[in-house]
Amino acid sequence: MNWISNVVRPKIRSFLNRRDVPENLWVKCPETGQMVFHKDLEANQYVIPGSGFHMRMGPADRLKATFDDGAYEEVALPDVPIDPLKFRDERRYIDRLKDARAKTGAQDAVKVAHGLLEGLPVTVAVQDFGFMGGSLGMAAGEAVVTGLFTAAEKKTPFIMFAASGGARMQEGILSLMQMPRTTVAIQELREARLPYIVVLTNPTTGGVTASYAMLGDVQIAEPGALIGFAGPRVIEQTIREKLPDGFQRSEYLFEHGMIDMVVHRHQMRETLARVCRLMMKAPGVPPKGRLPAPAAA
């Protein structure tokens, strides 16, 4: 061995060694194929800069983008029985839960928080499609109910960001039971004369659409979101007909009177604040740089 083998060879070996590169450094737009650096996408609230396509947004980013200065207090959620049916298909349900929790760092599909939206106290729940497709089970149902009761107790509007493939089949009737439970909790919020605002994101389907996702006093949707009960392919196979272009997309639902507005994610916070203030009869916030008009003598 000489200095060449001691110095040159190790350098060549280290140069040729494959470096581990994270898989999510670049994100591809599903519509145009445009590649976007992940930090640029995060800074743009997960909206593709060129096409305007709205990618899925996790609960932490959603809450940060909604509350003033990104500051909020998470609402503690009650524990629920885990896998009471001892369900198993290709894998045990308990194993699927463990994988989802390890992947997302969350206990289940819904996170609830309380904070300020342009100075107005609000309670917000966010459904995470990344956790088993945002499916509605006992834990998610309990989280929505807890959020509604928290809003009623604190006398705040309740904002629900919905994203789900439907009821969680591994929990059977216990999952379906969450549909009437959440509906009853919404009615209690209404009896307290407090606003319930729903933001439908891509996708919102199944039992979630058939319950709390379509019961808002104001129904808002993000652009291009898939919203419906059964998916378009299932409907086409059932009725044996071709569906209209854009069927079940947020723009189609708006044109046919199923939702109140379609709002770009960059305008969502401002829109939610305006709707909450209007429904709570709270004083408006003057535009930045402009002082409120003096009170009449």
From Swiss-Prot:
Name of a matching Pfam family: Carboxyl_trans
Major enzyme class: transferase
Keyword field: ATP-binding, Cytoplasm, Fatty acid biosynthesis, Fatty acid metabolism, Lipid biosynthesis, Lipid metabolism, Nucleotide-binding, Transferase
Stretches that traverse the bilayer: none
Chief location of this protein within or outside the cell: cytoplasm
Pathway where it operates: Lipid metabolism; malonyl-CoA biosynthesis; malonyl-CoA from acetyl-CoA: step 1/1
GO CC annotation terms, alphabetical: acetate CoA-transferase complex
A GO MF label: acetyl-CoA carboxylase activity
Keyword Transferase assigned: yes
Reactions performed catalytically: N(6)-carboxybiotinyl-L-lysyl-[protein] + acetyl-CoA = N(6)-biotinyl-L-lysyl-[protein] + malonyl-CoA
Lipid metabolism in keyword set: yes
UniProt domain CoA carboxyltransferase N-terminal: residue ranges: 25-294
Gene Ontology BP terms: fatty acid biosynthetic process; malonyl-CoA biosynthetic process
Subcellular location as annotated: Cytoplasm
The protein's Enzyme Commission number: 2.1.3.15
Quaternary structure, from the entry: Acetyl-CoA carboxylase is a heterohexamer composed of biotin carboxyl carrier protein (AccB), biotin carboxylase (AccC) and two subunits each of ACCase subunit alpha (AccA) and ACCase subunit beta (AccD).
Function, in words: Component of the acetyl coenzyme A carboxylase (ACC) complex. Biotin carboxylase (BC) catalyzes the carboxylation of biotin on its carrier protein (BCCP) and then the CO(2) group is transferred by the transcarboxylase to acetyl-CoA to form malonyl-CoA.
Family: Belongs to the AccD/PCCB family.
Listed name of the protein: Acetyl-coenzyme A carboxylase carboxyl transferase subunit beta
Organism encoding this protein: Azorhizobium caulinodans (strain ATCC 43989 / DSM 5975 / JCM 20966 / LMG 6465 / NBRC 14845 / NCIMB 13405 / ORS 571)
Gene designation per UniProt: accD
